[in-house]
Amino acid sequence: MTTKMPRLLPTLPLLFALLAAAAQSRGPASAEQRQRVVAIAHKLEAAPLDQTLFPEREWAKQWVLENPDVRIRMCMQLLPDLRRPRYKFRLEIVDQMMLSSAAFLIEHPDKAGDHLAENVGGVQGVLKVYTAIVKSNPDARVLALDEMLEKESRGKLVEFARETIKACRF
């Protein structure tokens, strides 16, 4: 079986250029749009597998990608075990990192540029999603996320994130 990914790679710069052009031509985000993103992020934290929320998730992801007002900087080093594509809920977790980070920045505009705070906000959303997923799918456990839950319960999540994001380039 062949993969289509190598053929798609040359088109990625064009896609990013088009997204950047669309973002620049857009005006500032409305307060209603911002609040909608926050509401969607929090709904998904509680019910990440609710299929009725999937269109909302897609809208919010697109909004975050195209909106120049809320610029997120995710450190994927915080989610190491999710790089393997076999993890069934990988997309839900990664999408939530993006949406929870955006929601954090919308709720805390004074933290724009604070990569640590932004990523901790994203990870806290991820841990809520992961907890909800594991509750209905006990076999969905991932060691790295279990360890982060344990760090969060001991008040060590910020310290862990601070050390981990040193390896990320923002």
Would you name each region that the model predicts?
Residues 1-2, 22-25:
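Basic/polar N-terminal segments that are highly enriched at the extreme N-terminus
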Residues 2-12:
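Bacterial N-terminal signal peptides that target proteins for export
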Residues 10-20:
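Bacterial N-terminal signal peptides
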Residues 20-21, 95:
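A generic alpha-helix preference that emphasizes hydrophobic side chains
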Residues 24-62:
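Immediate post-signal-peptide N-terminus of mature secreted/exported proteins
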Residues 52-164:
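Mature extracellular/secreted ectodomains of secretory-pathway proteins
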Residues 165-170:
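Domain-length accessory/inserted modules outside core catalytic folds
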